[in-house]
Amino acid sequence: MAAKERLDKLLCDRGWVESRARAQSLIMQGFFRVGGRVITKPGTRVPVDVEIEWVRPP
């Protein structure tokens, strides 16, 4: 089983955003799909090897 990490931290670690605060804002606005699902809670723990997509919110 893969290790899990907070989504906001994972986005920073992957270099997608410049800060955790920015990641949290974008996540709450619905900009990221994780494993095919839109996640809106920054503290959601996801596998570190999960596929993340940048999407336009509805």
Stretches found by the model and what they are:
Residues E51-P58:
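SAM-dependent Rossmann-like transferase core, predominantly class I methyltransferases
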Residues M1-V48:
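A basic, amphipathic helix-loop patch mediating RNA/tRNA/ribosome contacts
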